[in-house]
Each structure stands twice: as C-alpha cells, then as structure tokens.
C-alpha cells in the first residue's frame, strides 16, 4: 500500500489562489462603504456653495434697487418742490399778498410720501422760508376787515349794548362815581387789599361798587320791576342819608 505525497507546489498554488480572492472581495466592500459618504459630502458642499452665492447676489441686488429707488424718490421730491415753488411765485406775483380760498388743500394722510410738502426748515437765526409756509398753510388767516369790518363774517359783534351800561357812555359816569365814593371806601379797599395779599384771591366787595343811580342816572326810566319794601332814604349834598318817617305799610306792599 503506497501513499502519495502531495505536491507542495500545488499547495502553494492553492493558497495563492485563495488569498487574492479574499483581498478582492474586501476591497469591493470598502469601495461600497466609501462611495455614499463621498457623494453626500459633495452634494452638501454644492448646496452650501449655491446658497452662499444666492444670498450674496440677492443682497447686492437689493442694495442696488434700494439705492436706485432712493435716488429716484429724492429726484421726484426735488422736482415736486421746485414745481410748487414756481407755482406759488406765479400766484404771488399775479394775485398780490392775498391767497384765494380755491388754493389746493393739504394732502390726505393716505397720499404717498412724495406728495407731502418738504419739512419746515428753520435756520439758526430763526428765519423761515416763506414759500415753505405757503405750502404748509395755503389759506391765510382772516384779516381785520373780515372780523371787524362792515361785512364781517368771522365774528359776530352785537349792535345793542346790554343795559344798564353803554359801550360809549359808561366809562365817564363810572369813573366819576368811583371818584366821589373813593373817600368813603378807601379804608375798605385797603383792608381788602391786605386780605387779597394774604389769600391771593381776587374778590370784589359790594361797598366799592357805585350805586345804580350814580351809573344810570335818576331821571332815566328803567325797565326793571320795583322790589317790595321800604323806599330808599334821600341823601343830602354830603352823601349822608336823611332819616325820614317810615311810611305806613299799605296792603299793596304786604307780601
């Protein structure tokens, strides 16, 4: 019985045959694991790059549009201001210093910003441009003739003076009555002035006022109804009352 010894070359060939196969399979698995990571990294990098480029381009375009709109708005406002100034100068030269009621009114609050007049520019000396004031206030205030003249429409002036005083003759009589009564009420006025200085309240006493007869006169008829009661005593030239006999109460005076 004989045994055959295997050939070492064949064994070496077998081993050499199996080793390259195992190495090739492991390399294929490593390629399958590395390729998705590379693809994802490339996609993320491309997306980030495109986003940055879009943001930068959009900001530049927005700044350019804002600059163009600002320049256009400034140009339109400047042109609008000069047009209004020329129109105001023509109206001022043709119509004098008066402004008609048909002048354009102030724009509404919903109007765009370019329709509003320019802001009021006050210099350091306090001078104000007249044209700017004309644009802000197109209607001039009422004059003296409109308020106090014969055709006044802004203010009502009563034609009748309220009794018992008059608009023309009340001051001399009142001053004369106060001068005649100043000697008697001087002490009262001094006391009232001291009281007013302490309390700082403006009060008027009935003693300082002139009587009704001194202001209106004794001969002028009065439309006021007489009050029931004793008649006032007659006074002499010095101003002191003369005591007289009290009248008997009549049935008409009894209330």
Swiss-Prot record:
Sequence ranges of Basic residues compositional bias: 69-90
Topology term for the membrane: Single-pass membrane protein
Biased composition (Polar residues): 193-206, 234-243
Keyword Cell inner membrane listed: no
Keyword Transit peptide: no
InterPro entries in the cross-refs: BEAN1
Biased amino acid composition, Low complexity: 217-226
Ranges of biased composition (kind: Pro residues): 244-255
Transmembrane domains' residue ranges: 37-57
Protein name per the record: Protein BEAN1
Organism the protein comes from: Mus musculus (Mouse)
């Amino acid at each position: 019985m004989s045994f055959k010894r295997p050939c070492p070359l064949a064994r070496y060939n077998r081993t050499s045959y199996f080793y390259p196969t195992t190495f090739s399979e492991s390399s294929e698995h490593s390629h399958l694991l590395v390729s998705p990571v590379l693809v994802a990294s490339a996609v993320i990098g491309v997306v980030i790059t495109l986003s940055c480029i879009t943001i930068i381009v959009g900001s530049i375009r927005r700044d350019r549009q804002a600059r163009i709109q600002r320049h256009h708005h400034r140009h339109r406002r400047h042109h609008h201001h000069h047009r209004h100034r020329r129109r105001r100068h023509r109206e001022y030269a043709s119509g004098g210093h008066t402004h008609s009621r048909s002048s354009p009114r102030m724009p509404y609050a919903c109007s765009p910003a370019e329709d509003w007049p320019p802001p009021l520019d006050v210099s350091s000396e306090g001078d104000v441009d007249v044209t700017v004031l004309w644009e802000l206030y197109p209607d001039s205030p009422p004059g003296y003739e409109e308020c106090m003249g014969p055709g006044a429409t802004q203010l009502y002036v009563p034609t009748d003076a309220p009794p018992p005083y008059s608009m023309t003759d009340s001051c001399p009589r009142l001053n004369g009555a106060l001068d005649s009564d100043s000697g008697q009420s001087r002490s009262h006025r001094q006391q009232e002035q001291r009281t007013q200085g302490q309390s700082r309240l403006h009060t008027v006493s009935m003693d300082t006022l002139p009587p009704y007869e001194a202001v209106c006169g004794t001969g002028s008829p009065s439309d006021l109804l007489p009050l029931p009661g004793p008649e006032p005593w007659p006074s002499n030239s010095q101003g002191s009352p003369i005591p007289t006999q009290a009248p008997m109460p009549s049935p008409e005076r009894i209330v």
